[in-house]
Amino acid sequence: GDLNASHLDACFHALRENFDPEHGGFGNRPKFPTAHNLSFLLRYYKRTENTDALEIVKTTLQKIHQGGIYDQVGFGIHRYSVDNEWLVPHFEKMLYDQALFVQANLECFQVTKDPYFSRTVDEILTYVSRDMTSPEGGFYSAEDADSEGEEGKFYVWKQEEIENILGPNDATLFLQVYRFEKDGNFLEEVTHEKTGTNIPHLRKSLDQHAHDKNQEPKESRKKIRSLHAKLFAHRKKRIHPQKDDKVLTDWNGLMISAFSQSAKALNQEKYLKTAQKAADFCLSELRQKNGRLLKRWRKGKAGLPAHLEDYAFLSQGLL
């Protein structure tokens, strides 16, 4: 039958029934970000003014951003969480997750005007521009979960590492804010014993930390970001997870859309330039003379006939 309001209501009620009010997200572990559900709920809120829909989105976006599923040092979102609290992720990073999570945060910012969500957008687009963009302008597909044969090794930290890099005072601040434990909070996959390493994560926002200490939030965030920069510079020296450097037409369309929408909503010319360069790349390297698209490109070679999702998502990006 035809799609009508009752179908939208049914979808909303199903999501609300499955919502985790304590940790955000839907259902039990493993938990995926499912940003498309959040975008639906934002549209449902705009249509119905049902504040429950908006609160579900805000809670979920904040809890994900504060969790270990989010790369607190280098930004970007990992693929999913193996627990209910978003603490321990499967450390792989997928391009489409970045695009969809940007879209959900951007739309939430447009509804709420809360800069918390626009800052998340800026962080993820910074990550994609820095680590997931080819010199030609296309976006790479993914980064692996493991390096040196260990999942997450690139992303986890020992407490003494933080102390050596940041010094005693700054280390105390970082370890407290990001919930480090002396024995570690990252468990060995088979034995479930503590490994001595930590996944940085938050239990409350950086602004809430500042308020609790009677500090000005903007200055507090600036201080924390300076610590991130030191740790990021140190982390760059580690053996990096392997990058899947294929450029896929459909995922690039999603990312072009995320950059271009963010450019308009946040008035950021640099995001528009990134989107334009990626779009030009796709139309130059992934479009045949007869106008038909190809699905993938890697190291100068494009191939495979495109599918419907390639046309749909690249069209979305170009629009």
Language-model features and meaning:
Residues 247-319:
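Long, K/E/R/D-enriched contiguous segments that form extended
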Residues 1-254, 258, 262-265, 297:
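Replace the tail clause
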